[in-house]
């Protein structure tokens, strides 16, 4: 059966970090609740933006190592398209213990929670605010934590956006290399090499320098080292792609996997995608993008997140972009996840796609002509009767 390929123009945006800017200048203050919540495995700093709306889930974020919720997510959540989404949802930002701004050093002998224990702290956070369910957004270590939380508590997670997720335990060779690097390499360099690819370190010098300065000047080095050790000691998530007639451990909720094409996490994200239910999973690869797509490509990620949420049935069609409405009206279709059906681009069941910029919005553009290529993740159509994950490149 033939499949239609659709090219969609995408407008790029200027980097959010310009020369001379600092992380502080990028972060806008919110009128929010901030609390240190006691859980089974210690205290965790939580920031709740907005008021939870009835039975609707909240968007819960978890950051990567070397970051906190502000440096990891504020540039994305301050972007205008994302603010359109957050009008419909409260947002709960979780900072890993000791990673928030101004965090005090842990006492000598403090046992930092394991990655599994960090995930086990989240039910207490939801209980504190009276929250029943979440749409999770995690990056790196945070993506691992939210995935573990969803595996343990599937009834609490309605969807996951996982940026740079690595489902595997660190191999013993990687572990040894990280230990040796710890003896010879400064902590900021270790974190920067985790966050950014080699190409990006040369092409986006100012961005890398900005985050390096944040790590040096704003992060508590002892606390950060404990968080890094916890991440490097993570267990394999032991997830498997479900097969008919077998019982496997995998995510039960829809998942959007996101990675930049020059990110150091590309291979890990592709590996994770191969272990998830292809009928519920979309892999979004961002072209000309490094390790932090939420920083360098907020427009694309916000649009993908909008369609992801609409596919879960939450945002009304009035919130769809002009392009999305026109495609819905015309009944244009895209190859479905099982490779055998076509599906209209409605707000129900829509997978992540990016769009041309609307003339009514004010944005800064640096280049034009990018396109969206929608293809099945593995194998050609007709060669495999089984379902295929959808891979979206933009």
Swiss-Prot record:
Q: Which terms are listed as keywords in the entry?
A: Acetylation, Cell membrane, Cytoplasm, Cytoskeleton, Membrane, Microtubule, Nucleus, Phosphoprotein, Repeat
Mark out the compositionally biased spans (Basic and acidic residues).
Answer: 345-371
Where does it primarily localize? Answer: cytoplasm
Coiled-coil spans are: none
Q: Which residues carry this modification: Phosphoserine?
A: 2, 319, 326, 330, 332-333, 336, 342, 352, 362, 364
**Which Pfam families does the entry link to?**
Ndr
Q: Which residues carry this modification: Phosphothreonine?
A: 328, 335, 340, 346, 356, 366, 375
The superkingdom of the source organism is Eukaryota
* UniProt biased composition (Polar residues): 327-339
Annotated region Disordered: the residues are: 325-394
Q: Where in the cell is it found?
A: Cytoplasm, Cytosol; Cytoplasm, Cytoskeleton, Microtubule organizing center, Centrosome; Nucleus; Cell membrane
Write out the ranges of the annotated region (3 X 10 AA tandem repeats of G-[PST]-R-S-R-S-H-T-S-E).
339-368
User: Where would I find the sequence repeats?
Assistant: 339-348, 349-358, 359-368
Q: Share the record's PTM remark.
A: Under stress conditions, phosphorylated in the C-terminal on many serine and threonine residues. Phosphorylated in vitro by PKA. Phosphorylation enhanced by increased intracellular cAMP levels. Homocysteine induces dephosphorylation. Phosphorylation by SGK1 is cell cycle dependent.
Q: Which GO terms describe its cellular component?
A: centrosome; cytosol; microtubule; nucleus; plasma membrane
Identify residues that carry N-acetylserine. Answer: 2
Q: Which InterPro entries match?
A: AB_hydrolase_fold (IPR029058), NDRG (IPR004142)
Q: How does it assemble?
A: Interacts with RAB4A (membrane-bound form); the interaction involves NDRG1 in vesicular recycling ofCDH1. Interacts with APOA1, APOA2, PRA1 and RTN1.
Tell me the protein family, please.
Answer: Belongs to the NDRG family.
Which PANTHER family does the annotation name?
N-MYC DOWNSTREAM REGULATED
Give the protein's biological function: Stress-responsive protein involved in hormone responses, cell growth, and differentiation. Acts as a tumor suppressor in many cell types. Necessary but not sufficient for p53/TP53-mediated caspase activation and apoptosis. Has a role in cell trafficking notably of the Schwann cell and is necessary for the maintenance and development of the peripheral nerve myelin sheath. Required for vesicular recycling of CDH1 and TF. May also function in lipid trafficking. Protects cells from spindle disruption damage. Functions in p53/TP53-dependent mitotic spindle checkpoint.
Q: What is this protein called?
A: Protein NDRG1
Q: Name the species this protein comes from.
A: Macaca fascicularis
């Amino acid at each position: 059966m033939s499949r239609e390929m659709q090219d969609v123009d995408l407008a790029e945006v200027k980097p959010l970090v310009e020369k001379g800017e600092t992380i502080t200048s990028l972060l806008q203050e919110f009128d929010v609740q901030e609390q240190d919540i006691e859980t089974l495995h210690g205290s965790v700093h939580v920031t709740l933006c907005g008021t939870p709306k009835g039975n609707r889930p909240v968007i819960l974020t978890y950051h990567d190592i070397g970051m906190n919720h502000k440096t990891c997510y504020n540039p994305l959540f301050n972007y205008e398209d994302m603010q359109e989404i957050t009008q419909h949802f409260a947002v709960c930002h979780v900072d890993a213990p000791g990673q928030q701004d101004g965090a005090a050093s842990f006492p000598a002998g403090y046992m930092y929670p394991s990655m599994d224990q960090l995930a086990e702290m989240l039910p207490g956070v939801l209980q504190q605010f009276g929250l029943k369910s979440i749409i999770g957004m995690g990056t790196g270590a945070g993506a691992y934590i939210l995935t573990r939380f969803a595996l343990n508590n599937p009834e609490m997670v309605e969807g996951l956006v996982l940026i740079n997720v690595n489902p595997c335990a660190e191999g013993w060779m990687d572990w040894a290399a990280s230990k040796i690097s710890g003896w010879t390499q400064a902590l900021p360099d270790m974190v920067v090499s985790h966050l950014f690819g080699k190409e990006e370190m040369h092409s986006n010098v100012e961005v890398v320098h900005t985050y390096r300065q944040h790590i040096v000047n704003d992060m508590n080095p002892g606390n950060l080292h404990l968080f890094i050790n916890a991440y490097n000691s993570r267990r394999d998530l032991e997830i498997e792609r479900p097969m008919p007639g077998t019982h496997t451990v995998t995510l039960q909720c829809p998942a959007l996997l996101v990675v930049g094409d020059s990110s150091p996490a590309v291979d890990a994200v592709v590996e994770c995608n191969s272990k998830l239910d292809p009928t519920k999973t979309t892999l979004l690869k961002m072209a000309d993008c490094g390790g932090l797509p939420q920083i360098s490509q907020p427009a694309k990620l916000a649009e993908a997140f909008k369609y992801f949420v609409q596919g879960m049935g939450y945002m009304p069609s009035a919130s769809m972009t002009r392009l999305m409405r026109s495609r819905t009206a015309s009944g244009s279709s895209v190859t479905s996840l099982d490779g055998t059906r076509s599906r209209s681009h409605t707000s129900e069941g829509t997978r992540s796609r990016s769009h041309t910029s609307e003339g009514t919005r004010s944005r800064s553009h640096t280049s034009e002509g990018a396109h969206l290529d929608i293809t099945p993740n593995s194998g050609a159509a007709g060669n495999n009767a089984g379902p295929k994950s959808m891979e979206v490149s933009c």
